[in-house]
Amino acid sequence: MMGCLPTKQVGRSTHSLNPREAVALAAETSFTVNEVEALYDLFRKLSNSIIKDGLIHKEEFHLALFRNKKTNLFVDRVFDLFDQKGNGVIEFDEFVRSLSVFHPDAPEEQKAGFAFKLYDLRQTGFIERHELKEMVLALLDESDLNITSDAVEMIVDRTFDQADTKGDERIDQEEWNEFVKNNPYVLRNMTLPYLKDLTMVFPSFVIHSEVSEADMVA
């Protein structure tokens, strides 16, 4: 159904990135202008892998992350958080802003906030026990780990024992921030090291960049 959307209204009609947009996105994220341009090249490939309309649909997102189109709660949640406008697709500016959270230089508070929203499935402002369990099961489903249901319950119980300091059977943002501060391993998947070397992954952008880094100062 998404493929039936009129691409004139939401898609991109050109194959080049507006230099002003590159500068603006670099100014509000952890990326340089050259890296934003490299991300645009990646975005174009992903957004035309199945439905050729210059937008990343959920099927394309699944394929990019896990090389399959299998439905999974974890992938769905990440997609929903990338889709900041809530229109069922990921546009380029959303792609850059969301990926910036995973940049090695992004503040830990941003990473913690994104992870909190990931687990807050019902978007109530709290992580409840059943939500944490659902997400743990979804993560295990995408991994090669074979863990018993008792072990899953143990993970959930241990997390709540440490994080739910108010003892109300739910974890709020403040409790979560303190929990990840004491358990930094929780956020280890929130950093993608290669995002710091995008111009090495796409070296042509260093040479052919349409915007110089000096323009960032203006």
UniProtKB/Swiss-Prot annotation:
A single GO BP: calcium-mediated signaling
Molecular function terms, GO-annotated: calcium ion binding; kinase binding
Induction: By salt, drought and cold stresses, and abscisic acid (ABA).
Record Gene3D superfamilies: EF-hand (1.10.238.10)
Disulphide connectivity of cysteines: none
Domain (EF-hand) ranges: 35-69, 70-105, 107-142, 151-186
Signal peptide segment: none
Family: Belongs to the calcineurin regulatory subunit family.
Purpose: Acts as a calcium sensor. CBL proteins interact with CIPK serine-threonine protein kinases. Binding of a CBL protein to the regulatory NAF domain of a CIPK protein lead to the activation of the kinase in a calcium-dependent manner.
Subunit-level organization: Homodimer.
Protein's UniProt name: Calcineurin B-like protein 5
Organism field: Oryza sativa subsp. japonica
Gene: CBL5
